[in-house]
């Protein structure tokens, strides 16, 4: 099953399989652009108010995730909450999307428990995936961009 954010390719996938057969999470692109423009995003607020997220991030640096190298994820932790090298904290809004992602994951867990529903969704996703195969994509690129003649070879 697909759990996807709201970027362009994922929108195309959802159009193929139907919104009932995909899990979408996260902000819309216009909201992301507004947040960049307004520069009022503070991931520390999310960290302080979301217990699930706070636990996950804390476990990144307290030895829970990597007991043999507890400081290995320190830079990531710091970049998500404070920023690094003069850059804004969490520039890809990972923490902002965390709540939405968690809700999508809970929907996945519930749907997985319903075997008939899960199997139907799996068949639909598999059947509708053909449009995204690389052969079709390359043919389309060639037809619309490259305009190359196919190579012929004896087999």
Residue ranges and their predicted role:
Residues 18:
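Extracytoplasmic/periplasm-facing segments of secreted or lipoprotein envelope proteins
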Residues 8-9:
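Phosphate/diphosphate-binding loops
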Residues 1-5:
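Conserved small/polar residues in nucleotide/adenosyl-binding loops
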Residues 22-155:
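C-terminal amphipathic helix plus adjacent low-complexity
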């Amino acid at each position: 099953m697909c759990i996807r954010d709201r970027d362009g390719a994922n929108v195309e996938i959802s159009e193929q399989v139907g919104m009932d057969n995909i899990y979408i999470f996260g902000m819309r692109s216009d909201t992301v652009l507004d947040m960049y423009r307004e520069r009022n995003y503070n991931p520390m607020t999310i960290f302080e108010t979301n217990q699930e997220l706070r636990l996950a991030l804390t476990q990144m640096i307290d030895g829970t995730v990597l007991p043999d190298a507890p400081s290995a994820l320190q830079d990531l932790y710091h970049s998500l909450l404070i920023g690094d090298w003069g850059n804004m904290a969490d520039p890809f809004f990972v923490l902002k999307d965390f709540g939405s992602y968690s809700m999508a994951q809970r929907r996945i867990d519930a749907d997985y428990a319903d075997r008939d529903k899960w199997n139907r969704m799996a068949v639909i996703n598999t059947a509708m995936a053909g449009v995204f195969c690389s052969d079709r994509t390359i043919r389309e690129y060639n037809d619309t961009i490259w305009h190359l003649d196919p190579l012929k070879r004896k087999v």
